[in-house]
Curated annotation (Swiss-Prot):
The gene is rps-21. It comes from the Eukaryota. It comes from Caenorhabditis briggsae. The keyword Ribosomal protein applies. One of its GO terms (cellular component) is cytosolic small ribosomal subunit. This is Small ribosomal subunit protein eS21. One of its GO terms (biological process) is endonucleolytic cleavage to generate mature 3'-end of SSU-rRNA from (SSU-rRNA, 5.8S rRNA, LSU-rRNA). It is found in: Cytoplasm, Cytosol; Cytoplasm; Rough endoplasmic reticulum.
Amino acid sequence: MQNDAGQTVELYVPRKCSSSNRIIGPKDHAAVQIDFVDVDPETGRMIPGKSTRYAICGALRRMGESDDAILRLAQKDGLVPRDELKSN
């Protein structure tokens, strides 16, 4: 498709699930995208460029695996310590 300036633009940019690497289709309305950001402790505002984005497909959400997938990804990226949520 072309815009008014004659440049070719895409209407849909496909995403991949961060956990399963499945392509998230345009009709997957159950898919979510979550951004975790670093916050300045003094101002309470987001620090630009310091964010981590995860996309979770609807299939994982339907199976009830999205919380485990996000926790595993956050632990891999160092957002959550590996032993943080282990029960005794």
